[in-house]
């Protein structure tokens, strides 16, 4: 039968004579219990015939810390103020704790009384470890600008535990580049770098439990850097690209940047309506010669960069020649007699059907840029500023020799001929 301790009983217990020669030790089993485990505080070194035990959960023999008193002869156990409802004293003096909680962590004292009314005291310590919940990685921001912003990561966990950090799944070296707080729960990087973009996790652990957070993904904005213009299958010397007449050319703008930059193209200093990373020239002519500039802009870093190339007709294309497009037109089609390498200082030109004589003149272009029809004009011919001639809706009688005559501002005259073939419809 459990009897409450009277004031007189407590007086007797406090008046016991201490036996200083005793060596009582207390060890928990299991040695590293997890919350919820059943734990026994096993007593070693008891000697002689004992009358009673007092268990304390605290640093001193104070009534406040008394868990229970136990009378050996009767088996009576009396709970004390520190009893949680989970403790029970064994006849051998050991203390059972059912479903131990982290709050049971601390110093335990066993006080014994023998028949000579001498007391012995033993001390022990027990650490009850929590089953850890997953922590959370928190950041001051998950999208930062390189070399401008500061990164702060915090591993948030309600439980005291050791902390490890992981970057892209691998253990993060101890503060090689990132400053770590003394408790390991905060990482700080002033002037964050692009190499530090990726997935961060933290892991909390104790001897009985390990738990890792979900990844937190960090983006670091940078650039644009190393802006360059690339091209496919053309001859390039330094910043000059040479292209054959009537050939196509694609210019690509590349840059190192996060996020991908916005692109603006300019031709001879004038902006083009093209927001793509590439620029196409479908058919190279003298009108396409000039300086092409790509400007890359990063909306996050507010930085920009540019690159330029000079595009020219190749040397082989400079000599004036006439190329029909298409090269083998059929009856009913339109054909353009495209002029390659026409004079840059052109004053006037004239097209003839056959030899360059007035009756054969199809049309002429005046210095004003307008063209006028000649005696041989059929109403299907159109002239262009680059000296090209369009003949619409071909018939078989359009086949034959065509002559182009040009006059420059310096008075230089050139004559060039081409033979046009028209295939009949099948």
From Swiss-Prot:
Residue ranges, compositional bias (Basic and acidic residues): 84-95
GO BP annotation list: sensory perception of sound
Residues in Ig-like C2-type domain copies: 134-219, 224-310
Keywords: Disulfide bond, Glycoprotein, Immunoglobulin domain, Repeat, Secreted, Signal
Tissue: Expressed in cochlear outer hair cells (OHC).
GO CC annotations on file: extracellular space; stereocilium tip
Location of region: Disordered: 77-96
Signal peptide: 1-22
Disruption phenotype: Mutant mice show loss of striated-sheet matrix and Hensen's stripe, a prominent feature in the basal two-thirds of the tectorial membrane. They have enhanced spontaneous, stimulus-frequency, and transiently evoked otoacoustic emissions.
GO MF: identical protein binding
Disulfide bonds: 155-202, 253-294
CDD domains linked to this entry: IgI_hCEACAM_2_4_6_like (cd05740), IgV_CEACAM_D1 (cd05774)
Any Pfam family matching the protein: V-set
Localization per record: Secreted
Coiled-coil stretches: none
Spans traversing the lipid bilayer: none
Glycosylation (residues): 38, 217
Function statement: Required for proper hearing, plays a role in maintaining the integrity of the tectorial membrane.
Subunit-level organization: Homooligomer; can for homodimers and homotetramers. Interacts with TECTA and TECTB.
Family: Belongs to the immunoglobulin superfamily. CEA family.
The protein's name: Cell adhesion molecule CEACAM16
Organism: Mus musculus (Mouse)
């Amino acid at each position: 039968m459990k009897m409450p301790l009277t004031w007189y009983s407590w007086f007797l217990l406090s008046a016991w004579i201490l036996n200083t020669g005793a060596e009582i030790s207390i060890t928990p089993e299991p040695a590293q219990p997890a919350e919820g485990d059943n734990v026994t505080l096993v007593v070693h070194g008891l000697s002689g015939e004992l009358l009673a035990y007092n268990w304390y959960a605290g640093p001193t023999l104070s009534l406040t810390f008394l868990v229970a008193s136990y009378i050996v002869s009767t088996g009576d156990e009396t709970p004390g103020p520190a009893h949680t409802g989970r403790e029970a004293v064994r006849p051998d003096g050991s203390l059972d704790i059912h479903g131990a909680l982290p709050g049971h962590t601390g110093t335990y004292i066993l006080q014994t009384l023998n028949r000579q009314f001498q007391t012995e005291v033993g001390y022990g310590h027990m650490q009850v470890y929590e089953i850890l919940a997953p922590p959370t990685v928190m950041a001051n921001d998950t999208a930062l600008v390189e070399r401008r912003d500061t990164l702060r990561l915090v591993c948030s966990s309600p439980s005291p535990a050791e902390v490890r950090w992981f970057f892209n799944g691998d253990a993060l070296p101890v503060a090689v580049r990132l400053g770590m707080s003394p408790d390991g729960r905060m990482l700080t990087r002033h002037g964050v770098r692009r190499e530090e973009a990726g997935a961060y996790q933290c892991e909390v652990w104790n001897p009985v439990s390990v738990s890792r957070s979900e990844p937190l993904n960090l983006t670091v904005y940078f650039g644009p850097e190393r802006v360059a213009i690339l091209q496919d299958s053309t001859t390039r010397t330094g910043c000059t690209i040479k292209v054959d007449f009537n050939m196509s050319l694609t210019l690509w703008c590349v840059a190192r940047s996060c996020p991908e930059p916005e692109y603006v193209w300019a031709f001879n200093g004038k902006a083009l309506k093209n927001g793509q990373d590439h620029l196409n020239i479908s058919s190279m002519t003298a009108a396409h010669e000039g300086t092409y500039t790509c400007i890359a802009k990063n909306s996050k870093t507010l930085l920009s960069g540019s690159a330029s190339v000079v595009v020219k007709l190749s040397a082989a294309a400079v000599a004036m020649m006439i190329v029909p497009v298409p090269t083998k037109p059929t009856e009913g089609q339109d054909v353009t007699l495209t002029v390659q390498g026409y004079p840059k200082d052109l004053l006037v030109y004239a097209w003839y059907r056959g030899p360059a004589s007035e009756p054969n003149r199809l049309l002429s272009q005046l210095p004003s840029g307008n063209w006028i029809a000649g005696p041989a004009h059929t109403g299907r011919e159109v002239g262009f500023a680059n000296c090209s001639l369009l003949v619409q809706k071909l018939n078989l009688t359009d086949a034959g020799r065509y002559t182009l005559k040009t006059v420059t501002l310096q008075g230089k005259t050139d004559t060039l001929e081409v033979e046009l073939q028209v295939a009949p419809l099948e």
